[in-house]
Amino acid sequence: MSRIVMVHGAGNDLWGPSSIKSRWFPALADGLAWHGVAIDEHDVTVAFYGDLFRKDPEDGYEPAVDRAGAIATVEELVQRLDPHVDLAELTKMLTENHFDRLLAQAAAYLQQPSLRSAARSRVADAIGPDTRVVVAHSLGTLVSYEALCAHPEWSVTDYITIGCPLAGDIIRDRLDPAPSDGVSPWPGSVLRWTNIVDPNDPAGRTTPCGRFGGQVTEYKVDNGHRVHDPEPYLNNRWTGQAVAAGLAAG
């Protein structure tokens, strides 16, 4: 089994594990190159669950979570934090950047037990005795966090989250396992958790530091106009540093 397992985020229902790996592997290799570390494709596996969201009209599919409803939920939460926020501008930003689609899939994951279980099983199937590093993006941080918590017997030592929405209360309160006294459980066998965030990424604005029962190391990056895209997160030197540390320790 691979030493590194990568868990994609929402919005990948029209892709597949090979196509995701073709984009993510070179980006991660560039991140590791900052530190003189080389990997080959056998070192990396993509835990793919995007097909669980891919339903065609021939299947008689009705979207379980309305995208407009997802936006309304976000608007309500943001307005609680800042009653003066321009909701029209917020809606425009969410729609133009496809966050409405991403939010709808995140909501479906949290609300549909069978989908949730199937996604977590995909992560479990990808992780083996040689896996030391898990890199997760966006919705993939929810799936991988819950899988890691459910399997403390795994040998994963390093957890790297990018574009991570885990710490937001609307997400964290619905995780399995749920927080206790305001603190969520540490993810299983993990020894080091590194969170990489672009401060302009709407998904990652709430830090997991201090909220998960252990020390999370966090680095801020600038992804330019691609604030939530995985590739600029992966090719960053801080991501490379965290993955390199996990490989060296293993």
Question: What role is predicted for each listed range?
Answer:
Residues 1-67, 71, 84-135, 139-250:
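Lipid deacylating catalytic domains
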